[in-house]
């Protein structure tokens, strides 16, 4: 059997390559986990020749313990997707569970498994109290069907439990991990990416972090410079259409560039309510656009933002935050999302999967050469 990972050396985050989107400073790990109390865990599922998928969990202490709901907002750029829990979240402006990411046809099993895991943690022992009358699991997805057999729906309750148990602060795994194991973007192998920004408010510094599951079409653009997939792969010696795998090309050896989806999760410790969090979430798509997304009609593009400032922000409008401070949070959302997408691509490795399809990693040397040439 061929190894699912064909190259695993020389990968680097955008900043490691000297590529810095925007001007705002980052948190210590430059990750969504820089927001206090936010942790990320992955369960990567690779089996046989056809399964390249997984689960990613974004956890906050209150959400995992069942202690409280957090204010949240949802923005949908294009609704070609299956996000469990989205309508209640949008209506009530609250997040009740960890946010889980997975593959399209596994989303329903993951939602059920999340409920089971939370129930056994908190309400399985009658002496610890009664379970709530209802709970709104939030699970989002992208379609990793090019590299993984989505109809197999291989995700189990144990995988969800593993992702929740693995959730940790500090550096976050990126690229071909968890829900990013089988995803592709902009003609290349992609996956999970994350970044953070710190902004100075009148009340003190606040942190915003972004995590993306990148799986969308378009033409990769790095700091304003186009990096066409066909040219980049040809420069790396990958010119045979067959090497892309059947169904993965649009002709002439160029990888298929249109379609796909992106899920963006933003977390912040800023004390803002759901109405303004929805506005923050909507700015994430500007960051996604900067990386070259084509936002096609068959792309499910969702951005969810939540605040960890429980007790200091409500689900309603928060008039205490001046517009000037909110503008800084908008900027942070744009910059962090842009960098998270780049990290999802730059940290991903060439992968072989379903039906012997191959998706190649971005040749980083070519990216650097392209940017040097564009800058004269």
What feature does the model see in each segment?
Residues 1-376:
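Alpha/propeptide regions of enzymes that mature by internal proteolysis
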């Amino acid at each position: 059997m061929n190894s699912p990972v064909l190259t695993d050396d020389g990968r680097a985050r955008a900043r490691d390559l000297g590529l810095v989107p925007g001007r705002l400073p980052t948190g210590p790990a430059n990750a969504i986990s820089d927001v206090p109390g936010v942790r990320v865990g992955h369960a990567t599922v690779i089996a046989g020749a056809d399964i390249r998928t997984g689960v990613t969990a974004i956890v906050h202490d209150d959400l995992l313990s069942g202690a409280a709901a957090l204010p949240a907002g949802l923005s949908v750029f294009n609704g070609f997707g299956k996000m469990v829990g989205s309508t209640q979240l949008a209506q009530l402006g609250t997040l009740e569970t960890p946010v889980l990411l997975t593959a399209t046809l596994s989303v329903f099993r993951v939602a059920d498994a999340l409920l089971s895991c939370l129930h056994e943690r908190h309400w399985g022992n009658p002496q610890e109290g009664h379970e709530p009358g209802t709970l709104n699991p939030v699970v989002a997805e992208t379609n990793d069907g090019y590299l993984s057999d989505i109809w197999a729906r291989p995700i189990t309750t144990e995988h969800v439990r593993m992702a929740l148990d693995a959730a940790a602060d500090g550096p976050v795994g990126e690229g071909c991990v968890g829900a990013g194991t089988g995803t592709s973007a902009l003609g290349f192998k992609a996956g999970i990416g994350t970044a953070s920004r710190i902004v100075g408010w009148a009340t003190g510094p606040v942190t915003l972090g972004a995590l993306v599951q990148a799986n969308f079409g378009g033409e990769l653009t790095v700091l304003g410079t186009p990096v066409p997939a066909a040219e980049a792969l040809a420069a790396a010696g990958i010119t045979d259409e067959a090497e892309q795998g059947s169904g993965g090309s649009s002709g002439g050896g160029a990888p298929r560039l249109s379609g796909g989806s992106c899920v963006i999760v933003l977390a912040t410790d800023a004390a803002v309510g759901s109405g303004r969090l929805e506005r923050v979430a909507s700015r994430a798509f500007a960051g996604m656009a900067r990386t070259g997304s084509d936002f096609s009609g068959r792309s499910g593009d969702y951005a969810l933002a939540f605040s960890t400032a429980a007790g200091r922000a409500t689900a309603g409008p928060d008039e205490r935050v001046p517009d000037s401070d909110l503008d800084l949070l908008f900027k942070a959302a744009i910059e962090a999302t842009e960098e998270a997408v780049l990290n999802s691509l730059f940290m991903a490795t060439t992968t072989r999967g379903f039906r012997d399809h191959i998706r190649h990693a971005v040749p980083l040397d070519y990216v650097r050469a392209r940017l040097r040439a564009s800058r004269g």
